[in-house]
Amino acid sequence: MNAVEIEEAISNLAEQPFDAVNFPYEFLRAFGNKDTTIKRLRGSSENKSDVENGLLQRNNIHIAVCPIGETNTVLNKLRASFATEKAKAKFILATDGVDFEAEDLTTGEILVCPYSDSPKHFGFFLTLAGISIVRNRESGW
């Protein structure tokens, strides 16, 4: 997938009513994960998350959907998670469908925004799709 396709997929996801059960899988699909990968992650043996309602994709991201108002607490749990470290996750992400918080664990950069604004920040996660980004020192991008 290219950046335009990813932006479109993330925008479509954010426009739909929030589905806590399927959000992590649809988020990964938006960044180019194949149906077979999603199917494997839905299976309990592939998902090694140690956080409630979490989904861990090895070498990529640890995502958790949480109750409203708990995004910061859950992001901290993801950060402290042994599974996050063991799986060498590059990102952690917590959302309740209202708020959206993420951290790039390689740079320490943190993203906090309303869930509805998350498509504006799709570039934060482009490395999940194998797209490298070069940041401008002055603007941060």
Stretches with model-predicted labels:
Residues 1-61, 65-141:
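Short, basic/polar, glycine-containing "phosphate-handling" surface segments that engage DNA
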